[in-house]
């Protein structure tokens, strides 16, 4: 996915915006220059030569981010855990870190709805700093794009611009350059997938219809004026992609150089994304044989049983190549696989409410659960037990601990470490979410009152309800119902 290119830059910018150690500026310079491998090598050297007590959560997190984006997923997961254990301060910081780390891992594993749930929860944290909030909004934009919701992705990026104004002059300039290129990237991606040759690309054709004139106005001019080498290189690539889609064969050599550069950086997964983008452009430009050549390294690694979101675009491109070459049966077989994956994705994505919009006071949160992916397997059972018994007013921590065979203290510690919440706080939060959903869903009909919703979810005392609800949403249940 194209977000892999921007992620390291967003990561280090968000850290620098949080008064992180000054030596992270050297990492920023390497990352802005597109030298991810060199940044990882420097980070690895630091990890090997620094005693454990001197390693900060920021250092470990950035190290894990670089590992994740360059394909070292197992090592990244371990370093995320180490970073989380280093966090000192409020429970909010722990919740933000665990949500954030789980979100990026989920996104790069193409578990898009889980990533969106995690990122959206970060945005609801009252203690989130400007850099972390912009990173979460960027993550939301990436997840929404992968779901084909380009209009909503644009809205998420637009919301970043307002937050960028809170940054220092240097950081604000970097964020604004990033936002300018992100907008241009989305415009080009949308143009490419909605080209006349791709009317049968059902996943994208069934998605929201972006107003190209409104969205594209002034976008390319802002993007071509950026000075950051990493972003400038991406803009040059996108311009060549447009040329290839228009049938200009001279663009192919430059696109091939971009592929080679990604390989030299060890950017394996991003190189996969580039191949798909280039193949789409070549197909749009009526060059199916060149598209086949670009796709061959992917074809050689497939085993025949791939069915995840990751392969959706590949099967579509391969089907179009075979159709152009009059291999009708092969094309039909590949298109069936594409259509099956596309339908699975659409069904999964349908779990996300249509009302999900960034920055609105009352928004319907994604139903995909972020807590499960943040907890170790044993303690996921405890969480699932909580969800199954939320309606019981007598649900206790002792009962939950006994259900999974651990002590109350062990359960408390695990929830604090991985969620930044105690079991009681999680129960209260989930109950308030359910009550709020009841009130919002029935606002138009008036068939549900506050007391009924509270009793349904195990809250018997009116004062307890008002205090807990106000703590979660900064308003009373009656105020929600009155909207």
Tell me the role of every PLM-derived stretch:
Residues 33, 70, 109, 147, ...:
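Structural motif corresponding to the intra-repeat A-B loop/turn of tetratricopeptide repeats
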Residues 383-395, 415, 419, 437-447, ...:
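Basic, amphipathic alpha-helical hairpins
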Residues 21, 58, 97, 135-137, ...:
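Residue register of alpha-helical TPR repeats
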Residues 421-455, 483:
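Terminal helix-turn-helix DNA-binding modules in bacterial transcription factors
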Residues 44-48, 81-88, 119-127, 158-169, ...:
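Amphipathic alpha-helical segments of tetratricopeptide repeats
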Residues 26-27, 63, 102, 140, ...:
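Structural register within alpha-helical repeat arrays
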Residues 442-480:
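Sequence-specific DNA-binding recognition helix
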